[in-house]
From Swiss-Prot:
Gene assigned in the entry: aroQ
Protein name as catalogued: 3-dehydroquinate dehydratase
EC annotation from Swiss-Prot or TrEMBL: 4.2.1.10
Naturally occurring in which organism (per UniProt): Campylobacter jejuni subsp. doylei (strain ATCC BAA-1458 / RM4099 / 269.97)
Reaction equations catalysed: 3-dehydroquinate = 3-dehydroshikimate + H2O
Assembly notes: Homododecamer.
Length: 159
């Protein structure tokens, strides 16, 4: 199983930017923790970070046929990007959205979420641990899809 982790604008500044909101853990440290959990679950991870909307859209599109699922922190683009929303919908892969802070306890503009309606699930407010929760969730969803496809194939074979 292969999962793409997509990090949006300013996520590369974790550990430096607004530590009181996002914590002291750097993006690279989050990725290392995810790699450890993935290796324990026989999952391969790829990581991508960009501050540019078009690059994120391109990366989502590249996921089609190459990965089993996506974990995305679209960061500020969560509230503004129809393009990222449409890319997620277009590839139709299991996708879990992550936000380190609880966006629903913050400024009103952060409570508008264009991404969530096209995602399998959303995890907010658990700090860096939210990435672990997202990883466990995407593994579960991908396993269910794999088992369903195997069952459907078996039924086709028995006809």
């Amino acid at each position: 199983m292969k999962i793409m982790i997509i990090q949006g604008p300013n996520v590369n500044m974790l550990g430096v930017r607004e530590v009181g909101i996002y914590g002291a853990m750097k993006m690279e440290e989050i990725h290392e923790q995810m790699k450890l959990a993935a290796s324990q679950n026989n999952v391969e991870l790829d990581f991508f970070q960009s501050n540019f909307e078009g690059e994120i859209v391109d990366k989502i599109q590249e996921c089609l046929g190459t990965v089993d699922g996506i974990i995305i922190n679209a960061a500020g683009y969560t509230h503004t990007s129809v393009a990222i929303r449409d890319a997620i919908a277009a590839v139709a892969l299991p996708t879990i959205e992550v936000h380190i802070s609880n966006v629903y306890r913050r400024e009103e503009f952060r409570q508008k979420n264009l991404i969530a309606p096209v995602c399998s699930g959303t995890i907010v407010g658990f700090g860096p641990f939210g990435y672990h929760l997202a990883l466990m969730g995407i593994i579960q969803i991908c396993e269910q899809i794999k088992n369903l496809r195997a069952m459907q194939q078996a039924q086709q074979t028995n006809k």
